[in-house]
Amino acid sequence: MTIRNQRLSLLKQPISSILNQHLIDYPTPSNLSYWWGFGSLAGICLVIQIVTGVFLAMHYTPHVDLAFNSVEHIMRDVEGGWLLRYMHANGASMFFIVVYLHIFRGLYYASYSSPREFVWCLGVVIFLLMIVTAFIGYVLPWGQMSFWGATVITSLASAIPVVGDTIVTWLWGGFSVDNATLNRFFSLHYLLPFILVGASLLHLAALHQYGSNNPLGVHSEMDKIAFYPYFYVKDLVGWVAFAIFFSIWIFYAPNVLGHPDNYIPANPMSTPPHIVPEWYFLPIYAILRSIPDKVGGVAAIALVFICLLALPFFKSMYVRSSSFRPIYQGIFWLLLADCLLLGWIGCQPVEAPFVTIGQISSLVFFLFFAITPILGRVGRGIPNSYTDETDHT
């Protein structure tokens, strides 16, 4: 048997054929830009987080009296421990940067539209799982911001009618954030990344069922090429750029994206003057704080994800790509600026004028989802020459 025949025989095996179908011979639109490379970057970030997390867990002790010291032990005594911790801590930030860019690319090019509704909804579920995983991971170092962040955020569950207080008690494992809480969060933080892997594989499988969107938003079965080697090489450029960007944070600014109060051991008797979550939670945190009522704030956070989940089902879009929708382009860039403003508001004190700015910014955020179905009706349709080949329902 020749080498070529051996290769073909190997690719016909069950597992190999699946990998070949989805990672090598997958038919890809030939006009994809670098904005379509953030999906593979997100996968790389997830692998980095799992690998570094497994090694960190070998030296971490989930106990309120030992957790903070075990983190310092990793930093000071474990060979390469400082690198593992900085890769894991900054890797979370890189993961969210990549995913946020991935989401905004999907919004700009309307990648959520038919027939990719399920792909988008799975992506929203993955995003929600990421938020939960990152939050409980932020608690594990058991510094001041870890402890008080856990206390404030978990207590929000008490806003749920009837069962809220029961849920909070279950989350805490008692009547306050304590050792039981830390143990539960450590177990969940170890488990959830593997659930994320499963959800990501479902996301990929759902995407490949109908194929990738493209910058023009026009579906064509003819103008496609194999994923390998063309888009591997194109993605490689993004991977190298990401590695350089990631390395700068690890080696030159490893603590810039964190909070200095988390280098102080948790003290239940001393409340920090300003409780701030990690930067990637700040836009959502700003929406939460903009509403004085606890129930209203929790409802607003739930509404954020409901809006994202409902977006694909507004079947009112003649043209997918924003390249041909100048009005939507302007609204999109307004949304992006608004999210950046919400991020800045989230780290400011709860006082005037920041509260008012946060309320206005939150209103603008939700108005985007309210007017998107209307904007879908504004503009010219797809040319008749593409009607037979294009799905623009």
Curated annotation (Swiss-Prot):
Q: Which CDD domains match?
A: cytochrome_b_C, Cytochrome_b_N
Record PTM: First mitochondrial-encoded protein to be shown to have its N-terminal methionine cleaved off.
Question: Membrane-spanning regions, if any?
Answer: 38-58, 82-104, 119-139, 185-205, 231-251, 295-315, 327-347, 354-373
What are the names of the required cofactors?
Answer: heme b
> A GO BP term, please?
mitochondrial electron transport, ubiquinol to cytochrome c
Keywords assigned: Electron transport, Heme, Iron, Membrane, Metal-binding, Mitochondrion, Mitochondrion inner membrane, Respiratory chain, Transmembrane, Transmembrane helix, Transport, Ubiquinone
Query: Which residues are listed for heme b b562 binding in this entry?
Result: 88, 189
The record, for PROSITE patterns, names: CYTB_CTER (PS51003), CYTB_NTER (PS51002)
Q: Which residues bind heme b b566?
A: 102, 203
Membrane topology term: Multi-pass membrane protein
Q: What does the note under cofactor report?
A: Binds 2 heme b groups non-covalently.
Q: Sorted alphabetically, which Pfam families does this protein's record hold?
A: Cytochrom_B_C, Cytochrome_B
Q: How does it assemble?
A: The main subunits of complex b-c1 are: cytochrome b, cytochrome c1 and the Rieske protein.
Q: What does this protein do?
A: Component of the ubiquinol-cytochrome c reductase complex (complex III or cytochrome b-c1 complex) that is part of the mitochondrial respiratory chain. The b-c1 complex mediates electron transfer from ubiquinol to cytochrome c. Contributes to the generation of a proton gradient across the mitochondrial membrane that is then used for ATP synthesis.
The UniProt record's further free-text remark is: Heme 1 (or BL or b562) is low-potential and absorbs at about 562 nm, and heme 2 (or BH or b566) is high-potential and absorbs at about 566 nm.
Q: What is this protein called?
A: Cytochrome b
The species this protein belongs to is: Solanum tuberosum (Potato)
Q: Which gene encodes it?
A: MT-CYB
